Amino acid sequence: YQREPTKEEVIKTLRDTGVEILANSLPVGSEKATHFYVECALEAGCAFVNNIPVFIASDPEWAKKFENAGLPIIGDDIKAQAGATIIHRVLVDLFKKRGVKLDRTYQLNTGGNTDFLNMLNHHRLASKKESKTEAVQSVTAQRFAKENIHVGPSDYVPWQKDNKVCFMRIEGRLFGDVPMNLELRLSVEDSPNSAAVAIDAIRCAKLALDRGIGGVLHEPSSYYCKHPTYQFSDDKAY
């Protein structure tokens, strides 16, 4: 058993080691732990990059605290470089622009890393499902009815290890009410896929620190995260 550090000890470590940016990649559902480290970052004078779906940057109270402290924050819930959510968003946005009326969709994900193992606990999964679902809903021409959209982790397959597989289906109607559907299978290595975007988010936080910009960085949050304060299309955010 290893004793957990106190808040004062964490703050002292952050200050003594010269940490400028604290990136949060705790397990999904770690709400209390995330709040603990956010408070530590604020008191230690660190910028914060929130890679998980515990809502901090998109929470007005937390956002105000970072603004008052003059510290930048990016969040919430990082989008992978070429992951299921970004591809789902781009396709839904494309169909909207092409006038396709969408009826229903699903995104089912399996993986074998500890992230997927952790999400077998459905009590920890609620914020993740909300984040991923809203990322897709926000780019639709007309929001899907609740029963017509399912987006979220589906199961833990140990032998997949860090490989993540997504099965996606989108159903809609073309000109003349003619039905269409699209099915897609995506296979990626989960950790490096997310790390690519997390690194860019950290770079943006550092630029903001150097320029004395505090509060939520809305542009990188909208481009890099699934649950930002403001949801823009990826083209606009870019």
PLM regions and their residue ranges:
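Glycine-/Pro-rich loop/turn segments that contact NAD(P) or position catalytic residues
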Residues: 30-32, 36-44, 49-104, 111-122
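Active-site-lining helix/loop region of Rossmann-like oxidoreductase modules
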Residues: 78, 82-214, 218
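Metallocofactor- and cofactor-centric catalytic cores in central/energy metabolism, strongly enriched
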Residues: 1-47, 56-66, 183-238
